[in-house]
Design a protein with these regions (language model features):
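Membrane-interface extramembranous regions
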Residues: 1-136
Length: 136
């Protein structure tokens, strides 16, 4: 049984991840700029690849039947894109302070998001089956 709280968290997270995936295609230049340029083959490739991943992971989180795999996939995705957050923080070091706050704020926020995805995953665990019947 899933608690109502973690059900809501999963649906909200899934919706936000899906919207982020859409934005990778609607405004790819923004995402290109935060991809570390040393990653082959190109920034646009990684923008689209992470957008596709988000478009897959988001709905997996929303649908209760696929939520466990969605939560694990979300954790993997959030860990995989963390280098882009680090690069963004470094790359934005000369930007106005309000933009730097956004870049620095993403670093600890990513840990919170991973923790939330983990909590969604653990909320979906099947309770252990108790066998109170005596042995034959």
């Amino acid at each position: 049984m899933v608690s109502a709280r973690w059900n809501r968290v999963a649906v909200v997270m899934g919706t936000l991840v899906t919207l982020a995936g859409v934005m990778h295609f609607a405004n790819p230049t923004f995402f290109d700029d935060i991809v570390p340029p040393w990653l082959p083959p190109s920034e646009r490739f990684w923008t689209y690849a992470s957008g596709v991943a988000e478009l897959i992971v988001g709905p997996l989180l929303i649908v209760e039947r696929t939520r466990r795999i969605g939560a694990v996939s979300a954790i993997a995705l959030f860990v995989a894109v963390y280098p882009a957050n680090l690069y963004m923080t470094w790359d934005w070091r000369d930007r106005p302070w309000n933009e730097q706050i956004v870049a620095y704020g993403r670093l600890p926020l990513q840990f919170v998001i991973v923790w939330l995805a983990w909590k969604v995953f653990t909320s979906m665990r099947t309770p252990a089956v108790r066998n109170d019947r005596p042995a034959r």
